[in-house]
Regions:
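Short amphipathic, positively biased membrane-proximal segments
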Residues: 1-123
Length: 123
């Protein structure tokens, strides 16, 4: 397995796992859906889970990997408001939970970088 392919498979696995958890534990995600979004939070929880699964499939397949990587980067940008919402909402929680919530915000930058790296054609 080439290094670039390994990165793509790992990113696809991360996205797929995240997508599955949106369906397995939607109650975790519902409270962090930004309140400015219209409609019920559960809709957005499931919609983001579907998006993560679709993007995972695109990243995993070599023929769609470039578009999948770009879609993954866009998805990581799109979920930034939810991570910011979680950080705000959890600001008074126990230190460990607060650290997790605060850590999700800056973690988006390396995830975006990773997705863009996967999107680049191999040399």
């Amino acid at each position: 397995m080439t290094h670039r392919r390994g990165e793509a498979v790992a990113l696809a696995g991360l996205l797929a796992a995240a997508g599955v958890t949106h369906f397995a534990r939607p109650g975790f995600y519902d409270p962090i859906v930004p309140r400015a979004l219209p409609g019920p939070a559960r809709f957005w929880t499931y919609a983001s889970g579907v998006a993560e699964l679709a993007v995972a499939a695109a990243v995993a397949h070599p023929a769609t990997r470039r578009r999948g990587g770009l879609a993954a980067a866009a998805l990581f940008v799109a979920v930034l408001p939810a991570n910011a919402q979680m950080a705000w909402d959890w600001r008074r929680r126990r230190p460990v939970k607060r650290a997790v919530a605060y850590g999700r915000v800056p973690m988006q930058a390396p995830l975006i970088w990773w997705a863009l790296r996967v999107a680049r054609p191999s040399r």
